[in-house]
């Protein structure tokens, strides 16, 4: 219910705002030459007040947030500048601060007919301690006890049963805590109502046809704005506005520029309150035509126009009305004198209303409307002036000052007209005094004291609005204290160094500083100085400077002291050896750091590499710090890498000083990678490359090695170069023996006496130029195929060796013993076979064959000549002695003999078979390969007559079929399973018995039975055959056995019986008829029960 209520509230609220916005956007200028300025939906400012709240009769008071310019008046200042955001206050309740507005009261329009009968003016303030609230109406504080209708919850002021006569006015919230008070903006409470029209009958208006007329609305008392419309004759027939009819949204009057006979009737003025939506109707005004003729033509007479001076706020929308009576009906036009009407402007109601949204300063100027017809024209001019609400440029910040210090606060705001400034202290006007000046937004207090502490507000206002900025002033007054700035009680330095003893006591006013050594005052000289912040500095310290130093801070509220003891020690010296060392990658070294120091001081050693501390745990065991003696330390570097080269630092730290020394370590290693590799020139088999030298890593580069990679290589391969050996001082070379028309990328590797470095970044991918192919096809062979065909096959040339585009093959062949070659072109680079067909070529004719290559650059070499025979002929002899034997219900075994041939050697045999009830051309076929002369046909139908033929085949085709033979498949095995299966288990065997299976008429006779048994959990079982309906099954191992029985016949195995589960048990006897288990003393009854009850898996 709660969520539904909130939804209804939200929809009603948005509906109210939408209707209110529509009502306002429809208002315009008046018959009385007045201007109406209404809010734009995107406007950030609305009059001189914040946007009002509206009270719904059913939902109570509704509040609309104030516009953005109003938000500038609400300042969030952190006390003594300790916080950067207002939210920080909520997180630290220990900080005390003055009041800060969270929400200020909004303007409210309260409908007099509201069912709520309650008005709430909201005010919320933060502060620590929590603020208290008071309210003012029209500048006078409200006594909550003076009227039973008043109440306050937190800071919200509530008026029950509000009355326009007693409660309308300007309200302000005053919030106070121990730091002072702040005053909110003025919020207006006004009441919305709509009275009734006078009930007096209105006189008829009689005009001549063609004459203009004005029908007066004379609205009843109302607040605030109302919206006008007119009803013609009866509701809801409304007067439609056009170039001839116009309704002024200022006076509500209806203007008809030229009356027609269709206008005769009764007119009623309908007014609607923009807030309450209440509507009332006026008495009807009859409009009649006189019978003394038609009105002649006359020039326009402007009846509605805007004022001579129009003022409007920046960002709002202005609407200017202009309408004229005349015959013919006048046309209205608009212009801006000495300028152009803004492009964003819109003309409404047949150009009678000029609407300019989102007003800007450059929209100001003189506007003119002109009414014109064939009899003449009339114009009217007025000036549009744009004003702006105050807007902050510079606000106030919370401030704390020492007593006696000067204060200067400045607030700046823009606006048109230019804003004036007023100052408030604790909610009351601040007037100039002997120490206080206020002028042009500047507040100056020449010497602050505790009475000046409090909450201050700067008020910037012009005739259209006001904004507030608030800040807190704290006056500090306290004796000197060192609690927040503690000083080291013992200071140790070395000779000839600087001593700095800080002395920064907190206090207000700022304490005066003095120093003593023992009981003698410290006087400044060339070595000793008291700095502006109170600290004592001693240069070139010596033993004579040792002792206790006392700093004293004094102000009018008291004094405080600190004592620091100074000790002067001998300076520390350090030596790091060896100073410069050259090593090779993989070697080790020890750096020794020795310190000479004051014996009363402890020393600590720190090691650095290239200015950064060495992390001994993250360096992979390369570094180890060894402390053999109190005054020395060693750095062990093992298995040195190139990255370990650089300047090593040893720093010795005592409580008095810190000294350091450095040593340089050079590491020789393999070269770094050469720079960018550039391909400068390309031919069909070479590429000229250049590169920038590699880093030699302190060992001269002896040679470079060129490597290449292509789509056909296994990774990077070293290539031959010119010169053959690329010395370390060279930066270019030529890669040779490359394959034409292949994409390559190159890299360079440098070598020095220590080793080979990392390769360079690969060059860009390049392709060598095209060339005539040089590689002939390999493995030329052939044979087989169909009769009269010569089949030639070869291994295709890899793309790597095709050497260019347009690659193909030239197939040349000639009968063995002849001289002329016949050549055929094969254009596919992937081709591996060519078939030449000639009906005159006898089977197995030998041919000499060679295969060559070509591309766009020319012809390449041929392969070696090989001899290939043409295809053999089809088999000519039919298989003999074909027999077909039925094996089972679905199988027939076929056997034949074949005759050897010289020109038609079979590759295999094809057996065709079909049912007796089907034609031969529907035959299915099975093929064999090679010299096999038998086949088992499977998947046949039982008890069915099949016809069969056999024929040989090879690549040339099929031979003649054998004579037709026939065979009938066996009848189906019995479909009835063995029934009434009985068993008796004794020891390690089980005796079975069952009822004999009797086959149906279309089933084969039972030849015997098969008993299938297996141990549970095993997939493989055993079979026992028997001709009788009984059997003995051995159970060799302990466990549970699964047993089933099938009848078998010449048609195969029949349907299986239901499975039984039999336990193998050495003691006792179990039968399938037993229903109790009491005799099984050694058998687990639970196990046996499970064995008998659980279902078994099928075979």
From Swiss-Prot:
Q: Which residues are glycosylated?
A: 138, 196, 397, 449, 540, 779, 816, 931, 1002
A GO cellular-component term linked to this record = GABA-ergic synapse
Q: What protein name applies here?
A: Contactin-5
SMART domains named in the record:
FN3, IG, IGc2
Which PROSITE patterns does the UniProt entry name for this protein?
FN3, IG_LIKE
One example of the protein's molecular function in GO is: cell-cell adhesion mediator activity
Q: Where, subcellularly, is it found?
A: Cell membrane
Q: What is the lineage of its organism?
A: Eukaryota, Metazoa, Chordata, Craniata, Vertebrata
Ranges of residues in domain Ig-like C2-type: 99-190, 196-282, 300-385, 390-474, 480-569, 571-660
Q: Where are the stretches annotated Disordered? A: 958-983
CDD domains given for it?
A: FN3, Ig5_Contactin
Superkingdom of the source species: Eukaryota
Give the organism the record lists. Rattus norvegicus (Rat)
Q: What is its main location?
A: membrane
Q: Does the keyword Transmembrane apply?
A: no
Query: Which family does this protein fall into?
Result: Belongs to the immunoglobulin superfamily. Contactin family.
Q: What does this protein do?
A: Contactins mediate cell surface interactions during nervous system development. Has some neurite outgrowth-promoting activity in the cerebral cortical neurons but not in hippocampal neurons. Probably involved in neuronal activity in the auditory system.
GPI-anchor amidated serine lipid sites: 1072
Arranged from A to Z, the UniProt key words for this protein are: Cell adhesion, Cell membrane, Disulfide bond, Glycoprotein, GPI-anchor, Immunoglobulin domain, Lipoprotein, Membrane, Repeat, Signal
């Amino acid at each position: 219910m709660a969520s539904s209520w909130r939804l209804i509230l939200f929809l009603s609220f948005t509906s109210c705002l939408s209707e209110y916005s529509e009502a306002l956007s429809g208002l315009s200028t008046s018959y009385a030459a007045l201007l109406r300025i209404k809010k734009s939906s995107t406007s950030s400012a609305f009059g001189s007040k914040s946007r009002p709240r509206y009270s719904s009769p059913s939902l109570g008071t509704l509040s609309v947030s104030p516009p953005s310019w109003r938000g500038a008046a609400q300042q969030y200042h952190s006390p003594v500048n300790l916080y950067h955001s207002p939210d920080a206050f909520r997180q630290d309740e220990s900080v005390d601060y003055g009041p800060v507005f969270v929400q200020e009261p909004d303007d409210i329009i309260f409908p007099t007919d509201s069912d709520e009968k309650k008005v709430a003016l909201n005010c919320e303030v933060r502060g620590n301690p929590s603020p208290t609230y008071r309210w003012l109406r029209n500048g006078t504080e409200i006594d909550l006890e003076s009227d039973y209708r008043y109440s306050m919850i937190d800071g919200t002021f509530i008026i029950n049963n509000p009355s326009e006569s007693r409660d309308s006015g300007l309200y302000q919230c005053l919030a106070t805590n121990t730091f002072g008070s702040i005053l909110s903006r003025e919020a207006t409470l006004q009441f919305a109502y709509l009275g009734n029209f006078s009930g007096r009958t209105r006189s008829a208006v009689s005009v001549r046809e063609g004459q203009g007329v004005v029908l007066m609305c004379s609205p009843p008392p109302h607040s605030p704005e109302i919206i006008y419309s007119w009803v013609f004759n009866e509701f809801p027939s409304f007067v439609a506005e056009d170039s001839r009819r116009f309704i002024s949204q200022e006076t509500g009057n209806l203007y008809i520029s030229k009356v027609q006979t269709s206008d005769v009737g009764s007119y009623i003025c309908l007014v609607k309150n923009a807030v309450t939506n209440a509507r009332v109707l006026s008495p009807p005004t009859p409009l009649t035509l006189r019978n003394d003729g038609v009105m002649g033509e006359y020039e326009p007479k402007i009846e509605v126009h805007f004022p001579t001076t129009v003022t409007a706020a920046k960002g709002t929308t202005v609407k200017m009305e202009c309408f004229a009576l005349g015959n013919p009906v006048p046309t209205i036009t608009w212009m801006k004198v000495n300028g152009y009407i803004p492009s964003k402007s819109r003309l409404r109601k047949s150009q009678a209303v000029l609407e300019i949204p989102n007003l800007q300063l450059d929209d100001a100027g003189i506007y003119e409307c002109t009414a014109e017809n064939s009899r003449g024209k009339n114009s009217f001019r007025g000036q549009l002036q744009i004003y702006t609400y105050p807007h902050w440029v510079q606000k106030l910040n919370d401030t704390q000052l020492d007593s006696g210090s000067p204060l200067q606060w400045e607030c700046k705001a823009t606006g048109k007209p230019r804003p004036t400034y007023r100052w408030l202290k604790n909610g009351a006007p601040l007037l100039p005094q002997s120490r206080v000046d206020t002028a042009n937004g500047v507040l100056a207090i020449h010497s602050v004291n505790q009475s000046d502490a409090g909450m201050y507000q700067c008020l910037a206002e012009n005739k259209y609005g006001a904004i507030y900025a608030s800040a807190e002033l704290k006056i500090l007054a306290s004796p000197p204290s060192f609690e927040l700035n503690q000083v080291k009680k013992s200071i140790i330095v070395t000779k000839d160094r600087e001593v700095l003893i800080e002395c920064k006591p907190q206090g207000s006013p700022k304490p005066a500083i003095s120093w003593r050594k023992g009981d003698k005052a410290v006087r400044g000289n060339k070595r000793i100085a008291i700095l502006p912040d109170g600290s004592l500095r001693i240069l070139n310290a010596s033993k004579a400077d040792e002792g206790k130093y006392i700093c004293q801070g004094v102000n009018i509220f008291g004094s405080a002291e600190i004592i620091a003891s100074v000790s002067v020690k001998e300076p520390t010296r350090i030596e790091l050896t060896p100073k410069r060392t050259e090593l090779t990658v993989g070697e080790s070294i020890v750096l020794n750091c020795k310190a000479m120091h004051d014996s009363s001081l402890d020393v600590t050693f720190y090691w650095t590499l290239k200015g950064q501390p060495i992390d001994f745990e993250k360096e992979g065991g390369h570094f180890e710090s060894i402390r053999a003696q109190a005054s020395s330390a060693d750095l062990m570097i093992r298995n040195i890498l190139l990255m370990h080269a650089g300047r090593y630092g040893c720093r010795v730290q005592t409580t008095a000083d810190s000294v350091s020394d450095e040593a340089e370590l050079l590491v020789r290693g393999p070269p770094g990678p050469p720079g960018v590799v550039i391909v400068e020139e390309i031919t069909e088999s070479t590429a000229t490359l250049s590169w920038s030298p590699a880093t030699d890593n302190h060992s001269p580069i002896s040679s470079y090695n060129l490597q290449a990679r292509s789509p056909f290589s296994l990774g990077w391969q070293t290539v031959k170069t010119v010169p053959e050996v690329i010395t370390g001082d060279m930066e270019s070379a030529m890669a040779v023996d490359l394959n034409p028309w292949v994409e390559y990328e190159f890299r360079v590797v440098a070598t020095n006496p220590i080793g080979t470095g990392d390769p360079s970044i690969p060059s860009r991918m390049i392709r060598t130029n095209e060339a005539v192919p040089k590689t002939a096809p390999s493995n030329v062979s052939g044979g087989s195929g169909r009769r009269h065909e010569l089949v030639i096959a070869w291994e295709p040339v890899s793309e790597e060796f095709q050497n260019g585009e347009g690659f193909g093959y030239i197939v040349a062949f000639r009968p063995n013993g002849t001289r002329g070659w016949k050549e055929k072109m094969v254009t596919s680079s992937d081709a591996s076979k060519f078939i030449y067909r000639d009906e005159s070529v006898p089977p197995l004719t030998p041919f000499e064959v060679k295969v060559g290559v070509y591309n766009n650059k020319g012809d390449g070499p041929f392969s070696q000549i090989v001899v290939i025979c043409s295809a053999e002929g089809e088999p000519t002899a039919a298989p003999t002695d074909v027999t077909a034997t039925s094996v089972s219900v679905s199988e027939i075994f076929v056997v034949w003999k074949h005759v050897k041939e010289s020109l038609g050697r079979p590759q295999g045999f094809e057996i065709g078979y079909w049912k007796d009830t089907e034609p031969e051309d529907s035959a299915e076929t099975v093929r064999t390969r090679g010299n096999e002369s038998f086949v088992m046909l499977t998947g046949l139908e039982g008890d069915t007559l099949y016809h069969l033929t056999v024929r040989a085949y090879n690549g040339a085709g099929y031979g003649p079929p054998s004579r037709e033979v026939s065979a009938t498949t066996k009848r189906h095995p019995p479909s009835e399973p063995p029934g009434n299966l009985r068993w008796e288990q004794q020891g390690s065997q089980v005796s079975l018995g069952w009822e004999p299976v009797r086959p149906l008429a279309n089933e084969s006779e039972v030849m015997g039975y098969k008993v299938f048994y297996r141990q549970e959990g095993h997939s493989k079982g055993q079979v026992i055959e028997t001709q009788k309906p009984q059997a003995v099954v051995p159970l060799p191992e302990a466990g549970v056995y699964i047993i089933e029985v099938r009848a078998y016949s010449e048609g195969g195995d029949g349907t299986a019986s239901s499975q039984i589960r039999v336990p193998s048990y050495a003691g006792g006897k179990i039968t399938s008829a037993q229903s109790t288990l009491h005799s099984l003393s050694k058998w687990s009854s639970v196990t046996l029960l499970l064995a008998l009850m659980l279902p078994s898996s099928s075979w």
